[in-house]
Amino acid sequence: MTTTKKRPEVLVPAGTLEKLKVAVNYGADAVFVGGQAYGLRSRAGNFTIDELREGIEYAHARGVDVHVASNMVTHEGNEKGAGEWFRELRDMGLDAVIVSDPALIEICSTYAPGLNIHLSTQASATNVETFHFWKQYGLTRVVLAREVTMEELAEIRKRTDLEIEAFVHGAMCISYSGRCTLSNHMSDRDANRGGCSQSCRWKYDLYDMPFGQERKSIKGEVPEEYSMSAVDMCMIENIPDLIDNGVDSLKIEGRMKSVHYVSTVANCYKAACDAYMESAEAFYAIKDDLINELWKVAQRELATGFYYKTPTENEQLFGARRKIPQYKFVGEVVDFDPATMTATIRQRNVILEGDHVEFYGPGFRHFECDIKDLHDANGNKIDRAPNPMELLTITVPQEVKPGDMIRSTKEGLINLYQKDGSSKTVRA
């Protein structure tokens, strides 16, 4: 373990230019994005060259680094043009590329010397010898495989001076650090070249072959047949362990997720790191609030993955041990008039007069109120606003700022385990 605490970088996903700006404004120290080539998220709204330039300029002006994921597994011919791509990224001021394929690493080193290369989690780095190997080729950081334990992480830290990046939040692949071909076989989309259809998230029935007799999951251990769908990672409670063991960068998954998600996770992990760097007492004073905040954007149950032990089926597979989140993202503030306490908001979901909502902003600012004096952009009084991206005005009891987000509570479902291990779904 390190003797002096070092504040880690909070690395936040940004699937679009809008999300990049939100991540920066909500506390990210660095963001990772995808370009239009060599990445693994073909549907993430990847950045054009002009958007990359704008995003880098915006982030750098606020002291935030930008990394580009170029972590696809290349087949013969896929690498054509990569040298020019990496050189262009370097020349526009990019801080690092995230790469897994040795061919792309070699090309980047040759064509774009000086550009930091980070080894992607797709390369499945699970031991310090891997760090030693890639250091010879000029890499400056390694993103650990999600399967690495905290004990292994601590040992790696003692034996390398390369930067360590570790996933702390978001979706986990049921396969080994993304080495999966389910999508290739089931939907003809190559997961390792950006086309994953997330086949592991589908429902499955189990058949006893060759007789073809259907069998339910053993003893109800995997509710609702989500037999390959992993729960999500959340290490917010364990920030002290990550910092004490010298992790340089805390990586949050989710380039395809919403600005609601991006703003919330950036806010929470920045607050957690800042608090623990102040003192352990400061961290534990806000820990429960941080946990509750992250549940507001959760899509699945949350767990610590492989950090502390190999999880059992009931710990790792989706099946609901607590309620589905009861919050929905309804809008963001674009303007505020302090004289009339009127907020102009851009709507993202249906808003009704009288809805109970929560406003939140950078720095962990929160307050709740009811929607009052709802008007459309023409000043007409309305009771319901059903059209996404419409500009609306409301009266608020406290000051808000452009960029603040708005959530509405909604009726949800609760999935509970019963004594026999099966699941039961009830209304919230």
Where are the regions a protein language model picked out?
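Glycine-rich, positively charged N-terminal anion/phosphate-binding segment
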Residues: R41-H60
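Radical SAM/AdoMet-radical enzyme domain recognition
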Residues: I56-E57, D95, T110, N116-H118
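Gly/Gly-Pro- and Ser/Thr-rich, intrinsically disordered tail segments characteristic of DNA damage-repair
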Residues: K80, L115, L119-V128
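Surface-exposed amphipathic alpha-helical tracts and adjacent flexible/coil segments at the periphery
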Residues: M1-N25, A30-V33, A37, G55-I56, ...
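Alpha-helix capping/helix-boundary segments
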Residues: A103-L104
